[in-house]
Amino acid sequence: MMAVKKSRKRTAATELKKPRRNQLEALGVTTIDYKDVAVLRTFLSERGKIRSRHVTGLTPQQQRQVATAIKNAREMALLPMAGPR
């Protein structure tokens, strides 16, 4: 008699990933302002780099707004420039 193989069902990679929480919604922020340094710091790494939207869970439009606000705040010397590589 031949042994019967058990079929293993693979789970898709998308089923394993849980959806990222939108950090702006979690903070209760509706408009992004370059003067709101406390909120903008949550989107910076410890080296001062802007975090990707895959990390922050932002929409593409929100990510562009956050990036622009961070760049404006850097120009006004409210936030530090990115650190050494």
UniProtKB/Swiss-Prot annotation:
What role is this protein assigned?
Binds as a heterodimer with protein bS6 to the central domain of the 16S rRNA, where it helps stabilize the platform of the 30S subunit.
User: Which PANTHER family does the UniProt record give?
Assistant: 30S RIBOSOMAL PROTEIN S18, SMALL RIBOSOMAL SUBUNIT PROTEIN BS18M
Quaternary arrangement and interactors, per the entry?
Answer: Part of the 30S ribosomal subunit. Forms a tight heterodimer with protein bS6.
InterPro entries membership: Ribosomal_bS18, Ribosomal_bS18_CS, Ribosomal_bS18_sf
Lineage summary: Bacteria, Bacillati, Actinomycetota, Actinomycetes, Mycobacteriales
Q: Does the keyword Oxidoreductase apply?
A: no
Recorded protein name is Small ribosomal subunit protein bS18A
Q: Which gene encodes it?
A: rpsR1
Task: Say if the entry is tagged with keyword Kinase.
Answer: no
What would you give as a GO molecular function for this chain, any one? small ribosomal subunit rRNA binding
Q: Which Gene3D superfamilies match?
A: Ribosomal protein S18
Record's PROSITE patterns? RIBOSOMAL_S18
List keywords of the entry alphabetically: Ribonucleoprotein, Ribosomal protein, RNA-binding, rRNA-binding
Q: Which organism is it from?
A: Mycolicibacterium smegmatis (strain ATCC 700084 / mc(2)155) (Mycobacterium smegmatis)
One GO BP annotation here?
translation
